[in-house]
């Protein structure tokens, strides 16, 4: 699908007012390069998770790209279930724009997939997530942070059960699961509260 077709799909599917305003602004700018930059690719998931500029589009950090990544992680975890016991996930976030929203989005998707998550109730540094992931015996840890990047960025870092950044073979398996998820039709979710 080309960039303009993806843009049109997002205009049809997105209900979040902030993202709708961003989409409208792209079109009103009259600059096709703005739309192309937001939609020319999908944010790539790797050993460090996702990281990108905030805003509407497949090449941006937003509730839809976070939801898609989390659904892929949920599918990965549920495919690894031992003895019928679902895995658990620890989640923390920093003070960046939308970090708490993205953490709650991830928890909502995990819950809808039968996965319990432990979400810190307030801002936490990365070592707190590493500790919680190990201490609670979680399958995965998710840290919503863009680390050292400028404020227009946010990120979604994934840690293994050892509290460390995931290995490349796990990142590859999660990437494959994410690629099989349609961000508008396949993401299961429920209210956070």
Language-model segments: which ranges?
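Eukaryotic N-terminal low-complexity, Ser/Thr- and Lys/Arg-rich leader segments
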Residues: 1-5
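An N-terminal, well-structured beta->alpha segment
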Residues: 7-106
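Ferredoxin-reductase
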Residues: 9-12, 82-161
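Gly/Ser/Thr-enriched, mixed-charge loops and adjacent short helices
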Residues: 14, 34-38, 43, 154-193
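Alpha-helical scaffold segments in soluble metabolic enzymes
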Residues: 25, 68, 72-75, 128-132, ...
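Conserved short alpha-helical segments that host acidic/polar catalytic motifs at enzyme active sites
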Residues: 47, 111, 190
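Short, glycine-/Ser/Thr-/acidic-enriched flexible segments
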Residues: 50-52, 57-59, 96, 124-125, ...
């Amino acid at each position: 699908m080309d960039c303009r077709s993806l843009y049109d799909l997002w205009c049809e599917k997105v209900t979040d007012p902030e993202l709708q305003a961003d989409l409208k602004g792209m079109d009103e700018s009259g600059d096709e390069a703005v739309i192309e930059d937001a939609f020319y690719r999908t944010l790539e998931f790797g050993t460090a998770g996702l990281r990108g500029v905030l805003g509407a589009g497949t090449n941006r950090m937003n509730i839809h790209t976070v939801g898609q990544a989390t659904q892929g992680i949920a599918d990965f975890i549920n495919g690894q279930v031992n003895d019928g016991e679902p895995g658990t996930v620890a989640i923390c976030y920093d003070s960046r724009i939308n970090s708490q929203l993205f953490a709650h989005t991830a928890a909502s998707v995990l819950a809808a997939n039968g996965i319990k998550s432990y979400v810190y109730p307030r801002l936490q540094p990365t070592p707190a997530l590493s500790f919680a992931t190990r201490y609670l015996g979680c399958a995965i840890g998710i840290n919503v942070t863009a680390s050292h990047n400028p404020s227009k960025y946010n990120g979604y870092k994934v840690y293994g059960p050892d509290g460390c950044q995931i290995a490349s073979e796990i990142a590859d398996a999660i990437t494959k699961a994410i690629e099989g998820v349609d961000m508008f039709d396949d993401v299961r979710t429920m209210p956070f509260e």
